Curated annotation (Swiss-Prot):
Family: Belongs to the PTH family.
Record-marked site positions (Discriminates between blocked and unblocked aminoacyl-tRNA): N9
Organism lineage: Bacteria, Bacillati, Mycoplasmatota, Mycoplasmoidales, Metamycoplasmataceae
Any single Pfam family the record assigns to this protein: Pept_tRNA_hydro
Complex formation: Monomer.
GO cellular component: cytoplasm
SUPFAM superfamilies per UniProt: Peptidyl-tRNA hydrolase-like (SSF53178)
Molecular function terms, GO-annotated: peptidyl-tRNA hydrolase activity; tRNA binding
Reported function: Hydrolyzes ribosome-free peptidyl-tRNAs (with 1 or more amino acids incorporated), which drop off the ribosome during protein synthesis, or as a result of ribosome stalling. Catalyzes the release of premature peptidyl moieties from peptidyl-tRNA molecules trapped in stalled 50S ribosomal subunits, and thus maintains levels of free tRNAs and 50S ribosomes.
Source organism (scientific name): Mycoplasmopsis pulmonis (strain UAB CTIP)
Gene coding for it: pth
Any GO BP annotation: rescue of stalled ribosome
Record-listed tRNA binding positions: Y14, Y60, N62
Protein name: Peptidyl-tRNA hydrolase
PROSITE patterns noted in UniProt: PEPT_TRNA_HYDROL_1 (PS01195)
Entry keyword annotation includes Translocase: no
Length: 186
């Protein structure tokens, strides 16, 4: 069983914000599969296919580890079969990169997952939102995506959804081979 988790915050006030890019990728995957995240359990919502789960925690970003821990254990999913998707301020707007393992680099949702699963060996896809120049990170990431960035994010979300469908129906090696994402092992 494969588990793909998009991180974000629940609620209309967070919809279409930089911090909810993980949610947007999951929504795009569901759209391409013509499925709905119709199960609600473990304080999250998900769709369970034959060999995969696509999901969004409803715990708020900083407590995402609780959902990932519970769904992983309930469905007996190996850590090696989990991919987490989230926003990253240290990447340029629209740039995406994959990280096989390592620290959360200050991303609190990922930190929560690392703490709950007791390992840094968790695959993740980071979507760049750039670091703000003149405002606190916390307010910047929770603002709606501005018009001049919407097309860039729509494109990267669509591309990531296609690449993650490759993972769902194949394996991680195939995903890496078809992906043009930067592979970072740090």
């Amino acid at each position: 069983m494969k588990l793909i988790v998009g991180l974000g915050n629940p609620g209309d006030e967070y919809d279409k914000t930089r911090h909810n890019l993980g949610f947007m990728v999951i929504d795009k995957i569901a759209e391409k599969l013509n499925v709905k995240l119709d199960k609600e359990k473990f304080n999250g919502i998900f769709y369970k296919g034959e060999n995969y789960i696509i999901s969004k925690p409803l715990t708020y970003m900083n407590n995402s580890g609780n959902f990932v821990y519970d769904i992983k254990n309930f469905f007996d999913i190996e850590i090696d079969n989990i991919i987490i998707i989230y926003d990253e301020i240290d990447l340029k707007v629209g740039q995406a990169s994959i990280k096989i393992k390592g620290s959360a680099n200050g991303q609190r949702g990922m930190q929560s997952i690392i703490e709950k699963l007791k390992t840094e060996n968790i695959k993740r896809i980071k979507i760049g939102v750039s670091r703000p120049l003149y405002e606190p990170v916390s307010s910047y990431i929770l603002k709606k995506i501005p018009e001049n960035e919407k097309e860039t994010f729509e494109k990267v979300i669509d591309e990531l959804a296609d690449k993650l469908l490759t993972y769902i129906f194949n394996d991680f090696k195939t995903f890496i081979n078809v992906s043009k994402l930067k592979n970072s092992k740090k």
